[in-house]
Amino acid sequence: MQTLAQPAAATSGALPALLEFTRQAAAKVASLIEEEGNPNLKLRLYVSGGGCSGFQYGFAFDDQVADDDMQTVTDGVTLLVDSMSLQYLPGARVDYEDGLEGSRFVIHNPNAQSTCGCGSSFSV
């Protein structure tokens, strides 16, 4: 298991994180965990085959941490990513955005060569 703690602000000379979990996303996850009533929950991000572009992102709550999970902690909230999914996500940013189309979690993935209009599928 690999654990990365995300600082509130990056310090100069710091190594880039494998995956950024923004404060906005962490705050939304914290409120959802509170609604669930289980403080042991963590948000799991995974990549699976499918979608119109070949791969798709998925989110689920999980209270278990596997040996091959990477954990990223922002403001006390944990994001889990398994090692298979992580290979498609280095340098990606998990964010939560409020826009005209509504509110949603968004993954900004520099490894995606193309994405679907819905934003949940991509190709590499």
UniProtKB/Swiss-Prot annotation:
Its cofactor is iron-sulfur cluster. The keyword Metal-binding applies. Iron-sulfur cluster binds at C52, C116, C118. Signal peptide: none annotated. SUPFAM superfamilies: HesB-like domain. Keywords: Iron, Iron-sulfur, Metal-binding. Required for insertion of 4Fe-4S clusters. Belongs to the HesB/IscA family. GO terms for cellular component: cytosol. This is Putative iron-sulfur cluster insertion protein ErpA 2. Coiled coil: none annotated. One of its GO terms (biological process) is iron-sulfur cluster assembly. Pfam families: Fe-S_biosyn. One of its GO terms (molecular function) is 4 iron, 4 sulfur cluster binding. Binds 1 iron-sulfur cluster per subunit.
